[in-house]
UniProtKB/Swiss-Prot annotation:
Catalytic activity: N-acetyl-L-glutamate + ATP = N-acetyl-L-glutamyl 5-phosphate + ADP
A Pfam family hit: AA_kinase
Lineage, uppermost ranks: Bacteria, Bacillati, Bacillota, Bacilli, Bacillales
Family: Belongs to the acetylglutamate kinase family. ArgB subfamily.
GO terms (BP aspect): arginine biosynthetic process via ornithine; L-arginine biosynthetic process
E.C. number: 2.7.2.8
Entry GO MF terms: acetylglutamate kinase activity; ATP binding
Transition state stabilizer (site feature) positions: 8, 212
Organism: Bacillus cereus (strain AH820)
General function of this protein: Catalyzes the ATP-dependent phosphorylation of N-acetyl-L-glutamate.
Keywords: Amino-acid biosynthesis, Arginine biosynthesis, ATP-binding, Cytoplasm, Kinase, Nucleotide-binding, Transferase
Protein name: Acetylglutamate kinase
Location in the cell: Cytoplasm
Pathway the protein takes part in: Amino-acid biosynthesis; L-arginine biosynthesis; N(2)-acetyl-L-ornithine from L-glutamate: step 2/4
Keyword Repressor included in the entry's annotation: no
Length: 255
């Protein structure tokens, strides 16, 4: 059991997770060393609204001045992370919640001054993750990082991809509420970068699936070898540890 698997669960999925999801994590843990990265967008937006803080978005990124970053940190590292950890432990999965600033885990470069405290992963200090896993814990990571002793928000997809690349993980699993990419009603089990572009052009990939496949493509560029898009509300793992969904790699042809 030397291979790592990184599981990314978006904030919108956290409330939808059922017993099946946690059973799948148990199956993965029998085969691999598991790291989980989570988002928290809906809970962050709700808390910002409660605080009467208006939020602007540019190119899909939340403009994050200091007052917004304080709320992001409070939600991601506090309530969202701890509720997820408690849910895992309720299902007999030992977990430890961390943020990217713990142990200098996620170091970032600011994206731009215009959008404030938003960073892209520049370095991953994997020692903390490996130490926790060696003690049989699942690290559960809130996607914030550090730069010059300041805390920055990180897109959860790119945080997960950065961690997966740094660990040379066998696979990055993106948890969604759909079975994967569908073509004429049938699941596309394998695809690659060039084919995804074609499927978007043909209108096969539309709506909410587009950002999911874009996250997969970005992960490939960061060095991740294999990304699976799976339905977290269903059984998404075989007993062998293989995923049931759409797998995105380089140079694989389907359809």
């Amino acid at each position: 059991m030397n291979d790592y698997i990184v599981v990314k669960c978006g904030g919108s999925m956290l409330e939808q997770l059922n017993d099946v999801f946690f059973d799948c994590i148990k199956k993965l843990q029998q085969q691999y060393k598991v790291v989980i990265v989570h988002g928290g967008g809906p809970e962050i937006d709700a808390k910002l609204k409660d605080c009467n803080i208006n939020v602007e978005k540019r190119d899909g990124l939340r403009v994050t001045p200091k007052e917004v970053m304080d709320v992001v940190q409070m939600v991601l590292c506090g309530s969202t992370n701890k509720k997820f950890v408690m849910n895992l432990q309720k299902h007999n999965l030992l977990a430890v919640g961390c943020s990217g600033c713990d142990g200098k885990l996620l170091q970032v470069q600011p994206v731009s001054e215009e959008i404030g405290y938003v960073g892209e992963v520049s370095y991953v200090e994997t020692a903390l993750l490996k130490g926790l896993i060696n003690m049989n814990y699942i690290p559960v990571i809130a996607p914030i990082g550090i730069h010059d002793n300041e805390i920055y928000n990180i897109n959860a997809d790119t945080a997960a991809a950065g961690i997966a690349a740094a660990l040379s993980a066998k696979e990055l699993i993106l948890i969604t509420d759909v079975d994967g990419i569908l073509h004429e009603g049938k699941l596309v089990k394998k695809t690659d970068e060039s084919e995804i572009a074609t499927l978007i052009e043909k209108g096969v990939i539309t709506g909410g699936m587009i950002p999911k496949v874009q996250a997969a493509l970005a992960s490939l560029k960061m060095g991740v070898q294999k990304i699976s898009i799976v339905n977290g509300t269903k059984d998404f793992t075989e007993d062998t540890g293989e995923c049931i969904g759409t797998t995105v790699t380089r140079g694989v042809s389907i359809v």
